[in-house]
Protein backbone atom coordinates (compact mmCIF):
# COMPACT_ATOMS: atom_id res chain seq x y z
CA UNK A 1 0.00 0.00 0.00
CA UNK A 2 1.11 3.57 -0.50
CA UNK A 3 2.74 5.58 2.24
CA UNK A 4 0.33 7.92 4.02
CA UNK A 5 2.89 10.30 5.53
CA UNK A 6 2.87 13.46 3.42
CA UNK A 7 6.61 13.92 3.84
CA UNK A 8 7.55 10.39 2.81
CA UNK A 9 7.29 8.98 -0.66
CA UNK A 10 3.97 7.55 -1.66
CA UNK A 11 5.02 6.48 -5.11
CA UNK A 12 5.20 3.59 -7.53
CA UNK A 13 7.96 1.01 -7.28
CA UNK A 14 11.28 1.87 -8.94
CA UNK A 15 10.54 -0.51 -11.84
CA UNK A 16 7.15 1.11 -12.47
CA UNK A 17 8.70 4.56 -12.13
CA UNK A 18 11.31 3.72 -14.77
CA UNK A 19 8.73 2.17 -17.08
CA UNK A 20 6.56 5.29 -17.11
CA UNK A 21 9.51 7.71 -17.30
CA UNK A 22 10.32 6.31 -20.75
CA UNK A 23 7.14 8.01 -21.99
CA UNK A 24 7.65 11.40 -20.36
CA UNK A 25 9.58 13.78 -22.58
CA UNK A 26 12.12 16.19 -21.11
CA UNK A 27 12.15 19.66 -22.65
CA UNK A 28 14.96 21.83 -21.35
CA UNK A 29 14.68 25.60 -21.03
CA UNK A 30 10.90 25.65 -21.45
CA UNK A 31 8.83 27.66 -20.70
CA UNK A 32 11.88 29.72 -19.73
CA UNK A 33 15.65 29.25 -19.47
CA UNK A 34 16.70 27.02 -16.60
CA UNK A 35 13.37 25.16 -16.40
CA UNK A 36 13.01 21.53 -17.48
CA UNK A 37 9.43 20.79 -18.57
CA UNK A 38 8.13 17.22 -18.14
CA UNK A 39 5.82 16.61 -21.10
CA UNK A 40 3.31 13.81 -20.48
CA UNK A 41 1.78 13.88 -23.98
CA UNK A 42 3.87 10.92 -25.24
CA UNK A 43 2.45 8.84 -22.36
CA UNK A 44 -1.09 10.06 -23.12
CA UNK A 45 -0.88 8.94 -26.76
CA UNK A 46 0.20 5.37 -25.88
CA UNK A 47 -3.13 3.76 -25.01
CA UNK A 48 -1.69 0.74 -23.22
CA UNK A 49 0.72 2.88 -21.17
CA UNK A 50 -1.95 5.45 -20.30
CA UNK A 51 -4.28 2.63 -19.27
CA UNK A 52 -1.58 1.06 -17.09
CA UNK A 53 -0.76 4.42 -15.47
CA UNK A 54 -4.44 5.07 -14.66
CA UNK A 55 -4.90 1.54 -13.34
CA UNK A 56 -1.71 1.71 -11.24
CA UNK A 57 -2.74 5.02 -9.70
CA UNK A 58 -6.35 3.98 -9.09
CA UNK A 59 -5.34 0.66 -7.55
CA UNK A 60 -3.78 2.51 -4.58
CA UNK A 61 -7.19 3.91 -3.67
CA UNK A 62 -9.58 1.04 -4.41
CA UNK A 63 -10.21 0.34 -0.71
CA UNK A 64 -10.21 3.96 0.47
CA UNK A 65 -13.94 4.65 0.08
CA UNK A 66 -13.41 7.46 -2.42
CA UNK A 67 -16.72 9.15 -3.26
CA UNK A 68 -15.36 11.80 -5.63
CA UNK A 69 -12.26 12.78 -7.54
CA UNK A 70 -11.58 16.51 -7.86
CA UNK A 71 -9.26 17.55 -10.69
CA UNK A 72 -8.03 20.83 -12.14
CA UNK A 73 -8.26 21.62 -15.84
CA UNK A 74 -6.87 20.72 -18.30
CA UNK A 75 -4.57 17.69 -17.97
CA UNK A 76 -5.94 16.92 -14.53
CA UNK A 77 -9.32 16.29 -16.18
CA UNK A 78 -7.80 13.58 -18.38
CA UNK A 79 -6.38 11.64 -15.45
CA UNK A 80 -9.09 12.42 -12.91
CA UNK A 81 -12.03 11.41 -15.09
CA UNK A 82 -10.31 8.17 -16.10
CA UNK A 83 -9.52 7.35 -12.46
CA UNK A 84 -13.11 8.16 -11.45
CA UNK A 85 -14.26 5.66 -14.07
CA UNK A 86 -11.79 3.07 -12.77
CA UNK A 87 -12.85 3.61 -9.14
CA UNK A 88 -16.53 3.95 -10.05
CA UNK A 89 -16.86 7.24 -8.20
CA UNK A 90 -17.95 10.74 -9.17
CA UNK A 91 -15.85 13.47 -10.74
CA UNK A 92 -15.68 17.16 -9.78
CA UNK A 93 -14.16 19.61 -12.27
CA UNK A 94 -12.13 22.40 -10.67
CA UNK A 95 -11.88 25.24 -13.15
CA UNK A 96 -10.03 28.46 -13.67
CA UNK A 97 -11.95 31.63 -12.87
CA UNK A 98 -14.99 32.42 -15.00
CA UNK A 99 -15.51 28.97 -16.55
CA UNK A 100 -18.37 27.61 -14.42
CA UNK A 101 -21.99 28.71 -15.00
CA UNK A 102 -23.55 27.98 -11.59
CA UNK A 103 -22.91 29.33 -8.08
CA UNK A 104 -19.26 28.82 -7.20
CA UNK A 105 -16.79 28.54 -4.38
CA UNK A 106 -13.55 30.33 -5.25
CA UNK A 107 -10.01 30.05 -3.97
CA UNK A 108 -7.12 32.35 -4.80
CA UNK A 109 -3.63 30.87 -4.98
CA UNK A 110 -0.12 32.03 -5.69
CA UNK A 111 1.46 31.40 -9.08
CA UNK A 112 5.12 31.77 -9.93
CA UNK A 113 4.39 35.29 -11.22
CA UNK A 114 1.16 36.57 -9.67
CA UNK A 115 -2.08 35.06 -8.48
CA UNK A 116 -4.66 32.66 -9.88
CA UNK A 117 -8.19 31.68 -8.92
CA UNK A 118 -9.80 28.26 -8.97
CA UNK A 119 -13.54 27.61 -8.79
CA UNK A 120 -15.88 24.73 -8.07
CA UNK A 121 -19.68 24.57 -8.02
CA UNK A 122 -21.07 25.09 -4.52
CA UNK A 123 -23.02 21.82 -4.67
CA UNK A 124 -20.22 19.67 -6.12
CA UNK A 125 -19.32 17.96 -2.84
CA UNK A 126 -21.57 16.88 0.00
CA UNK A 127 -20.46 17.35 3.59
CA UNK A 128 -18.26 14.47 4.71
CA UNK A 129 -17.64 12.97 1.27
CA UNK A 130 -14.21 11.40 0.82
CA UNK A 131 -12.40 13.17 -2.01
CA UNK A 132 -9.23 12.26 -3.90
CA UNK A 133 -7.47 15.15 -5.64
CA UNK A 134 -5.86 14.13 -8.96
CA UNK A 135 -3.62 16.22 -11.20
CA UNK A 136 -0.88 15.65 -13.74
CA UNK A 137 2.08 17.31 -12.01
CA UNK A 138 2.94 18.31 -8.46
CA UNK A 139 5.42 21.18 -8.60
CA UNK A 140 5.20 23.94 -5.97
CA UNK A 141 1.89 22.63 -4.61
CA UNK A 142 -0.06 25.88 -5.04
CA UNK A 143 -2.73 24.48 -7.36
CA UNK A 144 -3.16 21.31 -5.30
CA UNK A 145 -3.42 23.30 -2.06
CA UNK A 146 -6.06 25.60 -3.55
CA UNK A 147 -7.99 22.53 -4.73
CA UNK A 148 -7.75 20.94 -1.27
CA UNK A 149 -8.91 24.20 0.30
CA UNK A 150 -11.94 24.24 -2.03
CA UNK A 151 -12.78 20.65 -1.09
CA UNK A 152 -12.54 21.48 2.62
CA UNK A 153 -14.57 24.69 2.20
CA UNK A 154 -17.35 22.60 0.68
CA UNK A 155 -17.32 20.20 3.65
CA UNK A 156 -15.47 17.38 1.91
CA UNK A 157 -12.63 15.34 3.38
CA UNK A 158 -9.40 15.19 1.38
CA UNK A 159 -8.17 11.58 1.47
CA UNK A 160 -5.03 12.15 -0.60
CA UNK A 161 -3.62 14.15 -3.50
CA UNK A 162 -2.39 11.94 -6.36
CA UNK A 163 -0.17 12.97 -9.26
CA UNK A 164 1.21 11.33 -12.38
CA UNK A 165 4.50 13.27 -11.94
CA UNK A 166 6.09 14.88 -8.90
CA UNK A 167 8.96 17.35 -9.22
CA UNK A 168 10.54 16.63 -5.84
CA UNK A 169 13.02 19.51 -5.92
CA UNK A 170 10.16 22.01 -5.70
CA UNK A 171 8.88 20.52 -2.40
CA UNK A 172 5.21 20.76 -3.34
CA UNK A 173 4.18 17.96 -0.99
CA UNK A 174 5.34 20.08 1.96
CA UNK A 175 2.65 22.67 1.15
CA UNK A 176 -0.13 20.09 1.40
CA UNK A 177 -1.67 18.93 4.66
CA UNK A 178 -2.81 15.60 3.25
CA UNK A 179 -1.08 12.42 2.12
CA UNK A 180 0.55 12.62 -1.33
CA UNK A 181 0.93 9.84 -3.92
CA UNK A 182 2.95 10.21 -7.10
CA UNK A 183 3.42 7.65 -9.84
CA UNK A 184 6.69 9.11 -11.16
CA UNK A 185 9.18 11.28 -9.30
CA UNK A 186 11.93 13.51 -10.66
Enumerate the language-model features and the residues they cover.
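PRPP-dependent phosphoribosyltransferase catalytic core
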Residues: 2-16, 22, 145-186
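Active-site-facing substrate-recognition patch
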Residues: 2-66
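Residue-level signature of catalytic and energy-coupling elements of molecular machines
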Residues: 34, 69, 91, 161
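Short glycine-rich phosphate-binding loop at a beta-alpha junction
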Residues: 65-73
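Conserved acidic residues
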Residues: 66-67, 129, 159
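Short Gly/Thr/Asp-enriched flexible loops that form oxyanion-binding sites at enzyme active sites
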Residues: 78-89, 148
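Short, glycine/charge-rich flexible loops or terminal/linker lids adjacent to PRPP-binding catalytic cores
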Residues: 89-131
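Conserved G/P- and acidic residue-centered "switch" motifs that form tight phosphate/ATP-binding loops
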Residues: 136, 141
Amino acid sequence: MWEQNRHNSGSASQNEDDEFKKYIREIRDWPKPGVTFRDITPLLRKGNILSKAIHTMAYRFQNEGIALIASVEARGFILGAAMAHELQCGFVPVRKEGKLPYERLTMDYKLEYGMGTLEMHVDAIDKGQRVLIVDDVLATGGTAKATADLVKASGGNVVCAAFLVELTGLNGRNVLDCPVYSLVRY
